[in-house]
Amino acid sequence: MAMTVHCDIVSAEGEIFSGLVEMVIAHGNLGDIGIAPGHAPLITDLKPGPIRLIKQGGEAEVFYISGGFLEVQPNMVKVLADTVQRAADLDEASAQAAVLAAEKALNEKGADFDYGSATARLAEAAAQLRTVQQIRKKFGG
């Protein structure tokens, strides 16, 4: 039997996942990070994108987070996310529409334009779309 670590994924809405996993793969500030049992303790920020859990038995479950933090302790991994959605609940058409709306907002700069906010919305929408496309490509969903 493979070694496991307890993982919690929590957002402002509440606990989204709690259980034993063999691996957690997340999109950190410096790139993807994989956490397996016995990983050194750390805290890092997470960019918008997928969180992939490899559960006991090798089954994968994917979530989309809009950003947050990852904490690793000797027997526990905790993801504190701004918002979380199960990847299966994401809609590609909605994600594509959000990307187009964010790109349009960037192109039509008005007097009260906030570039930082507009680019953040575009990055989040693009990450959501990438998550949907990755899942469809890997799992045929």
UniProtKB/Swiss-Prot annotation:
Alphabetic keyword roster: ATP synthesis, Cell inner membrane, Cell membrane, CF(1), Hydrogen ion transport, Ion transport, Membrane, Transport
GO cellular component entries: plasma membrane; proton-transporting ATP synthase complex
UniProt entry tagged with the keyword Kinase: no
Keyword Signal part of the UniProt annotation: no
InterPro entries, alphabetized: ATP_F1_dsu/esu_C_sf, ATP_synth_F1_dsu/esu, ATP_synth_F1_dsu/esu_N, ATP_synth_F1_esu_C, ATPsynth_dsu/esu_N
Pfam families: ATP-synt_DE, ATP-synt_DE_N
A molecular-function term among this protein's GO annotations: ATP binding
Chief localisation class: membrane
Gene3D superfamilies recorded: ATP synthase delta/epsilon subunit, C-terminal domain, F0F1 ATP synthase delta/epsilon subunit, N-terminal
Location(s), subcellular: Cell inner membrane
Topology with respect to the bilayer: Peripheral membrane protein
Family per similarity comment: Belongs to the ATPase epsilon chain family.
Purpose of the protein: Produces ATP from ADP in the presence of a proton gradient across the membrane.
Subunit structure and binding partners: F-type ATPases have 2 components, CF(1) - the catalytic core - and CF(0) - the membrane proton channel. CF(1) has five subunits: alpha(3), beta(3), gamma(1), delta(1), epsilon(1). CF(0) has three main subunits: a, b and c.
NCBIfam families, A to Z: ATP_synt_epsi (TIGR01216), PRK00571.1-4 (NF001847)
Name recorded for this polypeptide: ATP synthase epsilon chain
Species annotation: Pseudomonas syringae pv. syringae (strain B728a)
Highest classification ranks of the organism: Bacteria, Pseudomonadati, Pseudomonadota, Gammaproteobacteria, Pseudomonadales
